[in-house]
Amino acid sequence: MRKSVIAGNWKMHMTCADTKKYLEEFLPLIEEIPNDRKIVIAPPFTAISTFSNYTNFDYLNIASQNIHWEDKGAFTAEISPNMLIEHKVKYAIVGHSEPRKYFSESDEQINKRAVFAQSSGLTPIVCVGETLEQRERGEADRVITRQVEQGLENTDPSNLIVAYEPIWAIGTGKTCEASDANKICALIRSLIGFSDVIIQYGGSVKPNNIDEIMSMSDIDGVLVGGSSLDPISFSRIANFE
């Protein structure tokens, strides 16, 4: 049976002091979550060490917001798996729509990050998703197929999370209909060819829509942005019914 993975991506938010305060409020709220799910948070790199000092790893794990495909070298602004594992990081987000957009990350680069994350002992959370223009032109399935086939080449599906994040729904307040998201997640599962691969939905996930999203047959979790910054909101999402 697939475990649900509820992940929060803090993006460029939260200082070390903010992180300490957040966790002091958040951890008691998730102490009794069911054992059919995992909770993951991706803080900014500067807060990872603070985060690791205040986290109970029985029910909450750390993710990085990106990862490089080399252990070390002249790669300014990048971070390696070894640097992260030292601070108890277990997951790594790769291919998020923001690096794709702002830094022109290609499917090939995303694939290199994902493959190296796995070989280093981390579980990659690989993001895929279409723009509004692509969706309106009826190209969503084609775009997702390309991103999955190229971005996940040579990865191990048993140590993989794929996050479907329609770009037009990220931070906009617009949510993809749960049934539509479920169809795309089913497509992703069929493309990977491994029924137990964990597939998340991301895009304006909030306390008032989490229960419907998580009721879908092919959605195994969520990748949450803004709502993960509030410990009350994120605890409600983590404790979905």
Curated annotation (Swiss-Prot):
Top-rank taxon, per record: Bacteria
InterPro entries: Aldolase_TIM, TIM_sf, TrioseP_Isoase_bac/euk, Triosephosphate_isomerase, Triosephosphate_isomerase_AS
Pfam families to which the protein is assigned, alphabetical: TIM
Binding site residues for substrate: N9, W10, K11, G171, S204, G225, G226
EC numbers: 5.3.1.1
GO molecular function annotations of the record: triose-phosphate isomerase activity
Reaction it catalyzes: D-glyceraldehyde 3-phosphate = dihydroxyacetone phosphate
Subcellular location: Cytoplasm
EC top class named in words: isomerase
Pathway: Carbohydrate biosynthesis; gluconeogenesis; Carbohydrate degradation; glycolysis; D-glyceraldehyde 3-phosphate from glycerone phosphate: step 1/1
Keywords carried by this UniProt record: Cytoplasm, Gluconeogenesis, Glycolysis, Isomerase
GO biological process: gluconeogenesis; glyceraldehyde-3-phosphate biosynthetic process; glycerol catabolic process; glycolytic process
SUPFAM superfamilies xref list: Triosephosphate isomerase (TIM)
Catalytic residues, chain numbering: H96 (electrophile), E165 (proton acceptor)
Role description: Involved in the gluconeogenesis. Catalyzes stereospecifically the conversion of dihydroxyacetone phosphate (DHAP) to D-glyceraldehyde-3-phosphate (G3P).
Matching PANTHER family: TRIOSEPHOSPHATE ISOMERASE (PTHR21139:SF42)
Protein family membership: Belongs to the triosephosphate isomerase family.
Protein name: Triosephosphate isomerase
Provenance organism: Prochlorococcus marinus subsp. pastoris (strain CCMP1986 / NIES-2087 / MED4)
Gene that encodes the chain: tpiA
